[in-house]
Design a protein with these regions (language model features):
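N-terminal low-complexity, acidic/polar interaction/targeting segments
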Residues: 1-230
Length: 230
């Protein structure tokens, strides 16, 4: 049977691209402009090989050692280069398509850029959305649409989400998380959580809370508030 590249079964060695404010998820896309010499080399090598790069978040305090090997988080996301264009001076524009979560086992030296042996992580409590209705998906879809109605780009984001065509609950939840406004630390928490149902429950609570804040703000704007002490 043909293996699914989104369902890894073994440990692999991949190049690492650590960034301070970018958290990447499976089943999402990430455009990147590659200009640093070490990462230009990384992309060139990757295009000749497996085509995969591991995106991973830098830990706080990275600024003092950015050109070296600042500390990184343990959990990242592997992506495949699905489009690329080479620019003058060896720079690149690339598009990564997210594949799967991974855990760094240990880093491997010998290259200009960082690389590591990683453990490919499988999803826990995932659901097939093509075979039976999912109350979790329906509830998340409903409150996410309410949230998007209040955004200037909400219609465009909803079209990009393509919520009706997600085949797995993990894909659905990761796409929604990717498009929801969260601080980097919270996005990393979602990346590190392998249990899909727990991710879905947490995301539901966060979107519901944001919708409540939006409603309160609108109610306050819709009426004149008297702050007089008399």
């Amino acid at each position: 049977m043909e293996s699914d590249k989104n369902s890894p079964e073994k440990n692999i060695i991949i190049p690492l691209f650590p960034l301070p404010t970018t958290v990447f998820y499976p089943n999402t896309s990430l455009p990147l402009h590659i200009f640093e010499p070490r990462y230009r080399t990384m992309v060139a090598d990757t295009l000749k090989g497996e085509g995969k790069i591991g995106m991973i978040l830098l830990k706080p305090g990275w600024e003092s050692d950015y050109q070296g090997t600042p500390e990184i988080m343990t959990i990242g996301c592997a992506g495949e280069i699905t489009r690329h264009s080479e620019l003058p001076e060896g720079k690149y524009n690339i598009l990564l398509s997210g594949l799967y979560r991974f855990r760094v086992l240990h880093e491997i030296k010998g290259k200009l850029y960082r690389q590591a042996q990683v453990e490919c992580l499988k999803e826990i409590n995932d659901r097939d959305l093509t075979t039976e209705p999912s109350p979790t998906k329906e509830q998340l879809s409903r409150i996410m649409r309410l949230y998007l109605k209040n955004l200037p780009e909400g219609t465009k984001i909803e079209q990009a989400l393509d919520m009706g065509n997600c085949r797995k609950l993990a894909e659905f939840v990761d796409k929604l998380t990717h498009h929801f406004d969260l601080p980097v630390s919270k996005m990393q928490e979602f990346l590190e959580q392998q249990d899909v149902q727990k991710r879905a429950n947490s995301l539901y609570s966060l979107i519901e809370f944001k919708n409540q804040l939006i409603k309160i703000s609108k109610d306050m704007q819709g009426r004149e508030v008297d702050f007089s002490m008399n």
